[in-house]
Amino acid sequence: KSYLEEFELPYLRIPGFQKIKNNDIVVFNWPVDTMLNMYYTDKYHYKPIDKKTNYVKRSVGIAGDTLEIKEGYVYINGKKNELSDRAELQFSYLVQPKNRTFSKKVMVNNYDITDPFGIINRENTYQFIAMSDKTVDRFKNHPNVGSVEKYLSIEGERDSNIFPHNENYNWNNDFFGPIYIPKAGTTIDLNIENLPLYKRVIEVYENNTLKVNENNIFINGELAQDYTFKQDYYWLMGDNRHNSQDSRAWGFVPFDHVVGKPVFKWMSWNTNGKGFNKIRWDRMFTTVHGEGTPTSYFVPFLVFLGIYFGIKKWKKYKKED
């Protein structure tokens, strides 16, 4: 363990230059600490904030929003969330082949399908874990494809791995909410029905003692029928909607867990490539946010390095001369 529990400095952060907006990509400290805690969010909390694992997700919902998921798509305050053209949502699909198997090599090289896929039943139906709309449109023309159907959970069918992990909330990956995302200074009515949604916020993130006696809620020893939030919270999700550990599993991300916005992507690794093709050269040194196709600044970077070391060598030569 790289830290002491006996002595801990108070939380402090440098003021940021920008506020987090809807759909910004955010780096944050994973709020639930461990895989175990992801499914039992009201039982375990161990590490100091700065010692928690860094994650990167999209802030689909920000403080004060009401979020809902319908058929895998996010709705904010009743309106479908619109992403920039750089974002590519991916979903799982069921694919029925005509007569033969699918080659992993062909899937990777011809369709850029890098996530797992395989047969799931006796009818030889394949489940592809993640494909974008563009990939699906191309893949439908594959000579061995009979049918392609998006794989969605059933509305009203409860997934125990989904927040708030409570039998009274029949939510799953594709049908979730509505849920209010806490905003600093906002007061909500608090009762036994909505307590599972905000219990960890009140008890862990905002350092209160919370007890329930029959149907009565006590915060710091006093009967509570409402609660005022102390900080902002965010709802962070991955664009790979069926293969992402995100707020659907652990709930809200507090403001004090936010590290910032990523600006630059300096390396992109292709696990299916070989040799130099393991590096995605077109994605190196590209900006994270923005519209349109990302521009790589890798070549200008190499030119800059060449000039820098050239000048350095020339100065050394002149000094020796």
Model-derived regions: residue spans:
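Extended hydrophobic leader/signal-anchor segments used for secretion and membrane insertion
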Residues: 1-321
